[in-house]
Amino acid sequence: MKKTILLANLLILTLAIAGCGTNNNSANSSKSGNAAEAAPQASAEASAAADEPAKVTKIVVGTGTGFPKVCFIDENGKLTGFDVELIKEIDNRLPQYEFDLQTMDFSNLLLSLETKKIDLVAHVMEKNPEREQKYSFNKEAYAHWRNRIVVAKDNDSIHSLDDLKGKKVLTGATSAEAQILENYNKEHDNAINIVYQNGAANDTVSQISSGRVDATLAADFVLPIIDPQNKLKAIGDELSSADILYVFRKNDADSQKLSDAIDGAIKELKADGTLGKLSTEWLGADVTATTVK
């Protein structure tokens, strides 16, 4: 009888142990199954994320059409020039952005930037204290030049700003050259008669050579571009020298991010020689260097 009871107890114990083993195996099997099912799902999600195109931010670039060799419409109706082709090259090197060029009068560019109609200005813009008060600039200059007085070839009476007192001097509204003249007038009781230009840059030659105005101020590279017939001349010492940069909205995080990205692209363009080649092709000299060659 005791033997029978003992055998019965041993049988119950064996079944209990077997049951525990079965539960553990089931749990492990369940975990393995879940992991096996989760792995392909995670792989599929990762693959989908990899296949999803990176986000591209559209950037509206403001430029002009009236500056020969810089930003103008060619004989085929195409917008081109140094600034235009350079910004296209920068766009090619920044896959996270897509640049959309919008043209407008030069005098409207900075206002359009302020009102967020455009995101940056590309129009050989000089950095100066007046502009720095309202706008932000990238750090890596893509050109550098000097401003001087420009007069008719046969004019030997003008050599300095003081000689422009009582004279008509042509300049573009909101330009760096206009600010030189306006600052002079603030200190000299509006001695210079500033005439703000409405036409294209090459209209300067006809206005000066015809005597409608007496002079203008221009960067050193500009003269051979707008005056191939050599009717004008640059005289006197340089009035200012400046880095040429892109202009952005101030205190704007997205603008700063874009500015930093453009700086990186310009460094690449300088390093591989592309920037210098574009300058020589369009402007006749490498004005990307500190000293014009």
Where are these regions (language model features)?
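C-terminal motif of bacterial Sec signal peptides marking the signal peptidase cleavage site
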Residues: 15-19
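Ligand-binding clefts/hinges and TM-proximal coupling segments of bilobed small-molecule sensing domains
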Residues: 48-51, 55, 97-100, 176-196, ...
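Extracytoplasmic small-molecule ligand-binding "clamshell" domains
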Residues: 48-124
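Periplasmic-binding protein-like
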Residues: 65, 143-151, 228-264, 285-293
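Extended ligand-binding regions for polar small-molecule ligands
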Residues: 84-94, 155, 162, 174-175, ...
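Short helix-initiation/N-cap motifs at beta->coil->alpha
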Residues: 99-111, 156, 194-206, 242
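Acidic, polar ligand-binding/catalytic clefts
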Residues: 100-163
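A ligand-binding cleft/hinge motif common to bilobed small-molecule-binding domains
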Residues: 108, 125-134, 180-185, 206-241
